[in-house]
Regions:
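Small-molecule kinase domains that catalyze NTP-dependent phosphoryl transfer to phosphate-bearing small molecules
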Residues: 34-36, 79-87, 97-104, 128-172
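Amphipathic alpha-helical transducer elements in NTP-driven molecular machines
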Residues: 2, 19, 68-76, 94, ...
Length: 189
C-alpha cells in the first residue's frame, strides 16, 4: 500500500519530500489490494498498478513517503481493516506487518535473503539492471531499518537459495504445523 500511495504521488507530480503535502493528501487516492492469492493485484483509483509499484523509481521514493506519520497512521488503519475482514486468515507482507500492523498474528515469518539474490529477483521481475536494483534496495534497506525488525516471536526464513514455490511451501508447512491450514486428514504435510 505504501508503494501504491508513492506511485500515486509520483504520477500526480507531487514532491515526495514535502511532508506537509504528503500528509494532507495521503487519504485522497482509493487504494485497493486483492487478498486472493490466485489473483493478486493492487489498484489506485481503479487502475491496476501491480507492476508499476515495483519500479526502481517507486523504490527510491517509498521510504520518504512511508516515514510521514499521517501516511503511516492512515495505511496501518487500512491494513488492519483488511486483515480483520479476511475471515479465515490472510497472508500479509510488509516491513512492519509482524511488529506494528498485526503483532498478534498467529504465524509470523521474517523473510530474508542475501542482497544480491533479492536484487536479481527484483531485476528479473522488472527486466531491469541487477546492479542498479541492488543499489536501490540497499538505499531503501538503510532508510527503512527501523521498520525491518524481526518480531521476537517471528520465525526466520532465509530465502537466498529458495525459489518462490519453495518459500510458499515452507510457509505453508509452518502454517500446517500450527493448524492454521487444514490439519484433520491433511495429507499434504
Amino acid at each position: 500500500m505504501y508503494r501504491a500511495l508513492t506511485w500515486w504521488f509520483l504520477a500526480e507530480g507531487a514532491d515526495t519530500g514535502d511532508a506537509a503535502l504528503i500528509a494532507a493528501r495521503a487519504a485522497e487516492p482509493s487504494i485497493e489490494v486483492s487478498a486472493d492469492p490466485d489473483d493478486p493485484w493492487t489498484r489506485v483509483n481503479g487502475r491496476d498498478v501491480s507492476r508499476d509499484i515495483r519500479t526502481n523509481e517507486v523504490s527510491a521514493h517509498v521510504s520518504v513517503v512511508a516515514r510521514v506519520p499521517a501516511v503511516r497512521e492512515h495505511l496501518i488503519r487500512r491494513q488492519r481493516a483488511i486483515i480483520a475482514s479476511a475471515g479465515q486468515g490472510i497472508v500479509a507482507e510488509g516491513r512492519d506487518i509482524g511488529t506494528v500492523v498485526a503483532p498478534a498474528a498467529q504465524l509470523k515469518v521474517f523473510l530474508t535473503a542475501d542482497p544480491g539474490a533479492r536484487a536479481r529477483r527484483r531485476a528479473a521481475e522488472l527486466s531491469a539492471d541487477a546492479g542498479e536494483t541492488e543499489a536501490a534496495q540497499a538505499r531503501r534497506d538503510r532508510l527503512d531499518a527501523a521498520q525491518s525488525e524481526k518480531a521476537a516471536d517471528a520465525l526466520l526464513l532465509d530465502a537466498t537459495e529458495l525459489s518462490l514455490d519453495e518459500v510458499i511451501g515452507e510457509i505453508a508447512r509452518l502454517a500446517r504445523e500450527r493448524c492454521l491450514l487444514a490439519c484433520a486428514g491433511d495429507k499434504s504435510s
